[in-house]
From Swiss-Prot:
Belongs to the tetrahydrofolate dehydrogenase/cyclohydrolase family. This is Bifunctional protein FolD. The lineage of its organism: Bacteria, Pseudomonadati, Pseudomonadota, Gammaproteobacteria, Moraxellales. Homodimer. GO terms for cellular component: cytosol. NADP(+) binds at residues 177-179, 202. Catalyzes the oxidation of 5,10-methylenetetrahydrofolate to 5,10-methenyltetrahydrofolate and then the hydrolysis of 5,10-methenyltetrahydrofolate to 10-formyltetrahydrofolate. It comes from the Bacteria.
């Protein structure tokens, strides 16, 4: 999809970027790869998830990731630590998982209790097992277009765009949000795809004017429906990475009502970006297991 085709898309014909359906297709491929790893090594690819404390939302996310592992035949190693865990104790657990040949990927569930130095703990994850793309070294390698596992949500978004044959080169991209795990890596991935990228955030003046010129918009700011539908220009690609529960299910960071009559393509909420985030985590863990088994062809 070129700039010309984006700007000329007829109203009402927007493509729904269905992350749930794509993730299901990819899982079938991953199961075949997992079986091949088992056949060669006798080991089952495994993802270790570390949950510190008893936050219900975090526990739900960890359970969802464990279920995704099971669907492709992987092992899920759930490490639960009490909320009084110290930074040193958490680092010791990460070192233990780093050294285990039975662990191929490590995920430290965000957020950890406030007294723990989360960033310092992220940095202790072995780069070869950083399948959630949280280390500074991994980010730097990704930014320089070297081999690394990308942060899962932006990497999942890029895969979703690729699978729908959306050509990004030359597009004006606006990323709303600058978090270390979403906004910043998203902007860098789009830059590496030859977009002209603007990053907007809480101090941005006149957000509307930036949105109105965007060929591709990524809502990654964590504010319900901050970006209004009438700001979106005709034919834009709309990616909503937010989710905020409501009585009717949930909304994202972008007002999606009527967007099918404006955009050329958009992600639904829910069912767009979320499934691709977890799918990317599993896919990158399988990648790591293949590398450990000498099956990587890249």
């Amino acid at each position: 999809m070129s700039i010309a085709s984006i700007t000329s898309t007829a109203q009402g014909s927007a493509t729904v970027l269905d992350g749930k359906a794509l993730a299901k297709q990819i899982e079938q491929q991953l199961r075949t790869r997992v079986d091949a790893i088992k056949a060669k090594t006798g080991r089952t690819p495994s993802l270790a998830t570390i949950l510190v404390g008893d936050d219900p939302a975090s526990a739900t996310y960890v359970r969802m990731k464990g279920n995704a592992c099971k669907r492709v035949g992987m092992d899920s190693i759930r490490v639960e630590m009490p909320s009084v865990t110290t930074t040193a104790e958490l680092m010791a657990k990460i070192y233990e998982l780093n050294s285990s040949p039975d662990v191929h990927g490590i995920l430290l569930q965000h957020p950890v209790p406030a007294h723990i130095d989360e960033r310092a703990c992220f940095e202790k994850i072995d780069l070869a097992k950083d399948v959630d793309g949280v280390t500074c070294l991994g980010f730097g390698r990704m930014a320089m277009q070297q081999s690394a596992y990308g942060s899962c949500t932006p990497q999942g978004i890029m895969h979703l765009l690729e699978q729908h044959n959306i050509e990004l080169a030359g597009l004006e991209a606006v990323v709303v949000g600058r978090s270390a795990i979403l906004g910043k890596p998203m902007a860098m991935m789009l830059l590496n795809a030859n977009c002209t990228v603007t990053i907007c955030h809480s101090r941005t003046q006149d957000l509307e004017s930036h949105i109105k010129r965007a060929d591709i918009i990524v809502g990654a700011v964590g504010v319900p429906e901050l970006i209004k539908a009438d700001w979106i220009k005709a034919g834009a690609v709309v990616i909503d990475a937010g989710f905020h529960p409501t009585d009717n299910g949930g909304v994202g960071d972008i007002e999606l009502q009527g967007v099918e009559n404006i955009a050329s393509a958009y992600t639904p909420v829910p069912g767009g970006v979320g499934p691709m985030t977890i799918n990317t985590l599993i896919r990158q863990t399988v990648d790591a297991a293949e590398k450990a088994a000498g099956l990587d062809n890249s």
